[in-house]
UniProtKB/Swiss-Prot annotation:
Protein name: Uncharacterized protein At3g23325
Annotated family: Belongs to the SF3B5 family.
PANTHER family to which the protein is assigned, alphabetical: SPLICING FACTOR 3B SUBUNIT 5 (PTHR20978), SPLICING FACTOR SUBUNIT (PTHR20978:SF8)
BP term (GO), one: mRNA splicing, via spliceosome
InterPro entries, A to Z: SF3b5/RDS3-10 (IPR009846), Splicing_factor_3B_subunit_5 (IPR017089)
Superkingdom to which the source organism belongs: Eukaryota
Pfam family, one: SF3b10
Further comment: Was originally fused with At3g23315 to form At3g23320.
Cysteine disulfide links: none
Organism field: Arabidopsis thaliana (Mouse-ear cress)
Amino acid sequence: MQASDRFNINSQLEHLQAKYVGTGHADLSRFEWTVNIQRDSYASYIGHYPMLSYFAIAENESIGRERYNFMQKMLLPCGLPPEREDE
């Protein structure tokens, strides 16, 4: 692999990380990674009507109520963030 290839790959990766929030970066904590996964999952459930219907039937709720519940869960999907240790 040549130096120009490595530069091209790194610049493409930086572009993706700047464009899409969930792609992560080197300083991403475990909590932030988990939050991204949970939010992506909830967004997928809301966006795919059959999956949303499945959850609504399983929980005996209306589809609108399930959509609302999932959007509320997207705010803090994993609870409050842990305390940061200042260095």
